[in-house]
């Protein structure tokens, strides 16, 4: 016997708590149609909205964040967010095309330690 699990196709807006159809919410790029609250969008999601498909080349992928200032639990947060995002840093940077024009761009990711700019983000930004 196969048990089919129904997937919830509605979400509640984080701001106004309105019930929103998930597909419509995603088509609206995570903006609530009731109150215009903007949901969290990862760097890759934002990149895919901006850059022409297949043109982005990420730069400086060898860089990674370290706890140079000795913040408590920073290593735990780094490990957690590296697993969550697939990157050991907050800033996605590189080159690509927008409307067939060559561009260099950097996109911060709030999913990685709240989008804070550490040494790696600063280095990647200045290299871009």
Region annotations inferred by a language model:
Residues 1-128:
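Terminal-region recognition feature
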């Amino acid at each position: 016997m196969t048990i089919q699990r129904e997937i919830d196709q509605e979400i509640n807006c984080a701001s106004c708590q309105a019930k929103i159809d998930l597909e419509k919410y995603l088509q609206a790029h995570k903006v609530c149609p009731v109150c215009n609250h903007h949901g969290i969008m990862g760097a890759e999601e934002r990149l895919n909205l901006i850059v022409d498909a297949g043109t982005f080349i990420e730069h400086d992928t060898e860089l990674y964040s370290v706890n140079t200032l000795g913040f408590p639990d920073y290593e735990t947060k780094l490990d957690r967010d590296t697993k969550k995002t697939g990157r050991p840093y907050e800033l996605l940077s590189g080159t690509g095309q927008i409307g067939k024009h060559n561009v260099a761009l950097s996109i911060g990711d709030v999913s990685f330690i709240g989008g804070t700019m550490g040494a790696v983000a600063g280095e990647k930004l200045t290299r871009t």
